């Protein structure tokens, strides 16, 4: 039986605006798509892919909305992306759809789970729409120097809003990125990525090694930011020969921080490496499109948040759980225990595909001796 969706993106536009909506619809579908995998023929358990439980729906008429609304009660998390046009607000039936969206977003102010991203192609349309649409417009769109926002930028903002719906920290709302690079040959790409971040409304934060102290303070900062930040490693030819870069990578890796590796090597094929680059998502951008790096970073953070939602379904509500993207090292586990609050998590969950059985068993036995004891389990099998 198919599992209930953890999240749904609903794109609403008027059918007369299909030509204008096509590029935005395509960009949103790509941003939230599930990666097609080859048939799984192993005798082992099928790896958990939380993106399988993300839905994308387009609504262009009232009847389709009524069908969706009738089945939507069990979808806890929904982002409505609405292309506001005069045709949409002047259509009596589609106006009812806008009123329904406004009511859902208003009701979600206290409990969360639903939000709205409005992009208006007309000042008249935004004035005629329910007031909540004005408050949920794309921020600072005018600062882009364009009459219309580029489609892939809308996709990035939608991914960011999804983070907030799924439980990312709302203060501050901006995405935090830690950019790890070797200044010898990575500084220019890092600066290009920074400019790309500044070009996207709501994605303004920038983390670099210079912003964090060294030693224990740096380790503490990584630990505290592990669940609310994305680590981007710019893998250039000099990266593996810089001790500080390797230290940054391994600390972030062992502490379960969402990570993306940007393959910026001069050669397209590289030899074996002692650094576990292949254990995290890799992206190569030979055409220089830095927006794909942001897409990968946002999706990796959303993957962690979706896994937390899965954990909430599968674990006892009275037992707080902590999700790790990868099995933490003993040193990282000790640090995590040191940072626990007065009501510590009693259950740690990790995807089975990211563990070796002997390492999992060793860490589970060690955690059982901690004070208070912590239980370690696979995310797929936790009940």
PLM regions with names:
Residues 85-86, 236-237:
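Short glycine-/small-residue-rich Rossmann-like dinucleotide-binding loops
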Residues 237, 249-251, 259-267, 277:
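Catalytic core segments in nucleotide and nucleic-acid processing enzymes
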Residues 134-149, 278-292:
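Short secondary-structure boundary motifs at beta->alpha junctions and helix caps
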Residues 93-96, 131, 191-192, 244-247, ...:
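Short amphipathic alpha-helical segments
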Residues 123-137, 218, 267-282:
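Glycine-rich, charge-decorated loop segments at or immediately adjacent to ligand/cofactor-binding or catalytic sites
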Residues 283-307:
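Leloir-type glycosyltransferase catalytic cores
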Residues 1-84, 94-104, 109-112, 122, ...:
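Conserved N-terminal substructure of TIR/SEFIR domains
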Residues 238-243:
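Nucleotide-sugar-dependent
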């Amino acid at each position: 039986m198919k599992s209930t969706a953890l999240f749904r993106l609903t794109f609403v536009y008027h059918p007369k605006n299909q030509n204008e909506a096509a590029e935005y619809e395509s960009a949103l579908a790509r941003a939230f798509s599930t990666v097609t995998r080859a048939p799984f023929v192993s005798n082992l358990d099928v790896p958990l892919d939380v993106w399988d439980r993300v839905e994308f729906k387009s609504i262009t008429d009232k009847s389709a909305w009524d069908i969706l609304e009738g089945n939507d009660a069990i979808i806890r998390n929904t982002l409505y992306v609405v292309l506001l046009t005069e045709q949409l607000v002047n259509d009596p039936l589609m106006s009812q759809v806008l009123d329904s969206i406004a009511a859902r977003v208003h009701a979600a102010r206290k409990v969360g789970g639903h939000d709205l991203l409005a992009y208006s192609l007309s000042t008249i349309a935004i004035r005629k729409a329910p007031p909540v649409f004005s408050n949920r417009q794309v921020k600072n769109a005018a600062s882009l120097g364009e009459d219309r926002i580029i489609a892939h930028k809308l996709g990035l903002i939608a991914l960011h809003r999804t983070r907030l719906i799924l439980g990312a920290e709302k203060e501050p709302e901006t995405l935090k990125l830690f950019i790890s690079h070797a200044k010898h040959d990575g500084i220019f790409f890092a600066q290009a990525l920074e400019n790309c971040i500044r070009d996207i409304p709501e994605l303004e934060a920038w983390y670099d090694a210079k912003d964090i102290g060294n030693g224990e303070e740096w380790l503490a900062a990584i630990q505290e930011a592990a669940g609310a930040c994305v680590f981007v490693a710019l893998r250039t030819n000099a990266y593996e020969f810089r001790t500080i870069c390797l230290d940054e990578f391994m600390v972030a890796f062992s502490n379960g921080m969402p990570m993306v590796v940007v393959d910026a090597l001069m050669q397209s094929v590289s030899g074996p490496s002692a650094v576990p680059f292949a254990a995290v998502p890799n992206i190569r951008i030979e055409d220089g499109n830095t927006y794909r790096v942001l897409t990968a970073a946002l999706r990796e953070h959303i993957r962690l948040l979706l896994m937390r939602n899965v954990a909430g379904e599968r674990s006892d509500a009275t037992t707080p759980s902590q999700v790790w993207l990868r099995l933490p090292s003993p040193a990282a586990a000790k640090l995590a225990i040191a940072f626990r609050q007065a009501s510590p998590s009693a259950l740690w969950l990790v995807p089975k595909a990211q563990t070796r059985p002997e390492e999992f068993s060793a860490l589970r036995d060690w955690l059982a001796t901690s004070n208070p004891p912590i239980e370690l389990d696979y995310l797929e099998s936790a009940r």
